[in-house]
Regions:
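Hydrophobic alpha-helical transmembrane segments
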Residues: 1-61, 67, 228-272
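Residues that define the loop-to-transmembrane-helix transition and helix capping
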Residues: 25, 95, 165-166
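Hydrophobic/aromatic positions within or immediately flanking transmembrane alpha-helices
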Residues: 28, 98, 168-169
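Transmembrane alpha-helical core residues of multi-pass small-molecule transporters
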Residues: 30-34, 104, 171-178
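Secretory targeting signals
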Residues: 33-68, 72, 102-166, 232-241
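Terminal transmembrane helical anchor/hairpin motif
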Residues: 47, 168, 174-272
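Helix-loop-helix units of permease transmembrane domains in multi-pass membrane transporters
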Residues: 71-110
Length: 272
């Protein structure tokens, strides 16, 4: 009788395999380049560094669906080449294996976002530029991860069923949608407005928009509070709550659906 694979065992296995995966250094290089260059730019440019930080986190959040699509696509491709995804679909507990893969990839994305944020903020600090409060920055990083969880669950299934390109294409669509809902790249920085609140009710219904909104709204609320705009800060905090609740509920539903259907899921066959 085949031994049952627990989630903890599957997660340890994923962690060990990730240490040898090119996904780790790709995430590290991307985060280093993005955080370092953006930090150096806003440390010495004439732009307001508070709004520059907001714009940077908007970019991080908007890019999260694309990163998720690429990560899930490459991970599924590697599983397919290693043995037609037997490590995920051929084990005694697909639920544990799939959940561990999703959590491992999400953790890698969180680590990349955190490292990029650290480099960006370090550059501003060394230049003596003002930044939002540390709790708001931490909440922004965690918001990117929370907002991305649903995308990772969906994209991994898409990649296993229809291949790497389908997952990456869906991630690219998510990046475009997230930026469009914010009014474009650096819209708030250019206009001097809190663009995180732009169409927040509609953004709460779009999973691709969650990482960027959950990243930018706590920062904008912190900035507004520091400016003495208490009413605006409360409105931004309320918008964050709306998006966060929608994200948590929908993510729980998607996770439950993925786990419930895991044992009936069929991936690609060797020739497909």
């Amino acid at each position: 009788m085949m031994a049952r694979v627990t989630f903890a065992h599957a997660l340890r296995s994923e962690a060990a395999r990730l240490r040898r995966s090119p996904l780790v250094w790709r995430h590290a290089v991307l985060a280093t380049v993005l955080g370092g260059l953006a930090g150096a730019y806003f440390a010495f440019s004439a732009w307001d560094s508070l709004m520059g930080t907001d714009a940077f986190f908007q970019l991080l959040g908007a890019g999260a669906p694309l990163l998720a699509g690429i990560s899930c696509g490459l991970a599924a491709d590697a599983e397919q080449r290693a043995g037609e995804a037997a490590n995920l679909l051929g084990v005694s507990s697909r639920r544990s294996a799939l959940a561990a893969k999703i959590v491992a990839l999400l953790g890698l994305g969180l680590a990349a976002a955190a490292w990029a944020a650290v480099l960006f903020c370090a550059a501003l600090a060394l230049a003596g530029r003002p930044m939002p409060e540390l709790p708001a920055l931490a909440l922004a990083v965690l918001g990117i991860a929370l907002g991305s969880a649903c995308s990772y669950a969906i994209f991994l299934i898409v990649a296993l069923k229809w291949g790497r390109n389908a997952s990456i294409g869906l991630g690219a669509l998510g990046f475009i949608a997230a930026m469009a809902l914010l009014g474009g790249l650096a819209n708030g920085l250019v206009t001097g407005t809190f663009s995180g609140a732009l169409g927040a009710e509609a953004a709460a219904l779009v999973p691709f928009a969650w990482p960027s909104r959950l990243a930018t709204l706590p920062l904008e609320a912190s900035i507004a509070s520091a400016m003495g705009a208490a009413g605006q800060a409360r409105a931004l905090a309320s918008a964050w709550t709306t998006v966060a609740l929608a994200c948590v509920v929908a993510t729980a539903v998607v996770a439950a659906a993925v786990l419930a259907c895991a044992n009936r899921f069929e991936g690609r066959r060797g020739g497909e």
